[in-house]
A protein has these predicted regions:
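OB-fold single-stranded nucleic acid-binding module
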Residues: 23-33, 44-47, 53-99
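Short, acidic/hydrophobic/Gly-rich beta-strand patch recurrent on exposed beta strands
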Residues: 36-41, 204
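Acidic, carboxylate-rich catalytic segments that either coordinate divalent cations
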Residues: 268-333
Length: 333
């Protein structure tokens, strides 16, 4: 039975399966070699130390291998670590990938069907045909369903890209109807395609990291390349529509300092940027709240990106709101 890292307590004996995220050697004060490991599963990470026969043990496995570990949890400088007495490499057939990599809590196929339903609301035949080419691309869809949306900022789990994309498309539907004169077809298409380059930018075979293409080009350029490749298969696709759609992709980060080659220059592009930013930040904060609230406290640990702590108020009584609020209810008495 798998013991997850977040279940390990001080002084407990541990025998479980882990993924080796980092591996290095050190020298003790007495001159002996020891092995330093970072072991991970879907619940977190823990440092492991091999104190005896470290050189022989180190030769038996490599970074990114799955291993079976026996040891004892001890506290060192207020952090748990494993003193390992036995470690051996195991094959992928002996593990469940869902034990090692964080995954969306939602059903992937249900989310994908919901995204297809959103896409069916697009009336523009050119944009509809463009999306259809992506839906028919089995290799792309396989990656799109499983990719994380980022390495650590938001939706950083398998299925995260699909979850974020669906959330953004649904936010577009809910907010666009509040305003007049918006091109909903273009907004919806852009919301579905805005981060598609992340299937190439991020590597997630053993851990979440950037691919060489991701580091050198980034998901915006990689996404533009995929869109242009599909548009070339549609000879009647209007050039001005192609330009506008690509503008959404290159501007959705909003500012040059955030990686956008251009700032949003249409009302729709501005809306996409702010909704995308909101969805990413809310998810990022929610993930942070799950992991970094000290026991007995209503304040989180310090969040470096937001440069602040977050307060978690007591749960208030749930209030059922009416589906529709009549106009006279909003008027001042």
């Amino acid at each position: 039975m798998k013991t997850y890292i977040n279940e390990i307590r001080e002084n407990e004996s541990v025998e479980s399966l882990f993924l080796v995220k980092e591996k290095s050697s050190g020298i003790t004060k007495t001159g002996s070699t020891y092995l330093r490991l970072k072991l991970v599963d879907r619940s977190g990470d823990i440092e492991g130390r091999v104190w005896t026969f470290a050189e022989n043990v180190a030769a038996s496995f490599e970074k990114d291998d799955f291993v079976r570990v026996t040891g004892k949890a001890v506290s060192f400088q207020e952090h748990l670590q494993l003193n390992i007495t036995h470690i051996e490499k195991i094959s992928e057939e002996e593990i469940l990938f869902s034990d090692f990599f964080p995954m969306t809590e939602r059903d992937i196929e249900e989310m994908f069907q919901s995204l297809l339903e959103v896409g069916r609301q697009i009336k523009n035949p050119h944009l509809s045909q463009l999306l259809q080419l992506f839906w028919e691309d089995e290799s792309f869809i396989k990656l799109f369903k499983m990719a994380p949306a980022s390495k650590w900022l938001h939706h950083n789990y398998l299925g995260g890209l699909l979850e974020h994309t669906l959330s953004l498309a649904q936010l577009v539907l809910k907010n666009a109807c509040h305003y007049t004169g918006l091109d909903l077809d273009l907004l919806l298409t852009a919301s579905i395609l805005h981060d598609l380059g992340k299937v190439d930018e991020l590597s997630y075979y053993r851990s979440f990291d950037y691919s060489d293409e991701g580091r050198l080009l980034g998901h915006i350029i990689l996404g533009i390349e995929r869109v242009e490749d599909k548009i070339r298969q549609l000879p009647d696709f209007p050039a001005n529509l192609s330009t506008l759609l690509k503008h959404f992709l290159i501007s959705h980060h909003g500012q040059y300092i955030w990686g956008s080659p251009k700032r949003p220059m249409t009302v729709e592009a501005v809306m996409l940027h702010f909704l995308d930013d909101m969805d990413a930040k809310i998810n990022g904060i929610q993930q942070f709240l799950k992991r970094y609230i000290p026991e007995g406290s209503r304040w989180t640990a310090y969040h470096r990106m937001f440069d602040q702590h977050f307060y978690v108020p007591p749960l208030s009584e749930k209030v059922e709101l009416p589906d529709k609020i009549e106009k006279d209810q909003l008027e001042e008495e």
